[in-house]
């Protein structure tokens, strides 16, 4: 497998300063986990926060552990969701510095911005419901009349609070008059942040718990809860694959983003947008932020993006065998444990040349 941590040159990192400043907070995973977040001085000293976010940090110290958790989840979820793609989000580990794949207004940066925005609001909403934050609690009881056989109760995710605090944090750099970066890039990033939050809102669903004799479920207590991050990330992956390339154009009295190929219509609020086309990520090219796919695992029988033909860009692949140990022949013993044997199995793996 290609490593997920890479050395990058200072020149490449400098190009990020204004454009991807709004996702530098993903770098809080490096040292933010070791901070107690009980002193406002921490907000200024740690890498990853631009000035406007530092001010929000000082006013909302109790939220910062959730921000750190969201940064971890964004990195993990991004890499898991795109593990079958040539661009597999490995460069996000360089945060708070980034290579051009995340600093040039690309399709990939659109996905990461949207995912980070959704993840932060999701994390805060869940933290409210679990009692981790002193400034919020369960979500409000739904206004809609409950259906037959259930009643509103439990503790729903506080989506309203999560959206308010999350958007204030991730949008702050683009809304600041002092921030660097082009106006087109700021509009793009704000748009993609909003798309991420909309997918999060669309994931809100009714969840229920049964009550009754012997699990008869004669009565159900229900609440509104968010779906898990993998579901939200997969929705955003679909939008990533169908993202629209845009240009910054004068329309009427103001400039706005319009589709490059279909500039007769405005950008839809539901679609991810990008300004700069990406390379194919087949070969290593640090100047483009491409790590290449050499030594990446591929699937010989797949016809999707993880197939050896697509992943290896026609270069071919090498095969090797690997022995794995797994649990097998498991038996349940009364009461109350399961005993399993350990079995060895030989599997064939394929890596790109």
From Swiss-Prot:
Keyword Lipoprotein: yes
Domain of life: Eukaryota
Major localization listed first in the record, in broad terms: secreted
GO cellular component: collagen-containing extracellular matrix; cytoplasm; extracellular region; extracellular space; plasma membrane; protein-containing complex
Lipidation (O-palmitoleoyl serine): 214
GO molecular function terms attached to this record: cytokine activity; frizzled binding; growth factor binding; protein homodimerization activity; Wnt-protein binding
Protein localization: Secreted, Extracellular space, Extracellular matrix
Tissue: Transcripts are expressed ubiquitously in early oocytes but become vegetally localized during mid-oogenesis then enriched on the dorsal side by the 8 to 16 cell stage. The protein becomes asymmetrically concentrated on the dorsal side by the 64-cell stage. During gastrulation, expressed in the lateral and ventral marginal zone, and during tadpole stages in the somites and first branchial arch. Weakly expressed in the pronephros from at least stage 12.5, with kidney expression increasing until stage 35.
Glycosylation site list: 31, 38, 88, 299
Recorded consequence of changing residue 299 to Q: Loss of glycosylation. Prevents secretion. No effect on wnt5a-binding
Note: Xenopus and other lower vertebrates contain duplicated wnt11 genes resulting from an ancient gene duplication event, but the second copy has since been lost in mammals. This gene was originally called wnt-11 but was renamed to wnt11b after the discovery of wnt11r (now called wnt11).
The family this protein is said to belong to: Belongs to the Wnt family.
Protein name: Protein Wnt-11b
Organism of derivation: Xenopus laevis
Gene behind this protein: wnt11b
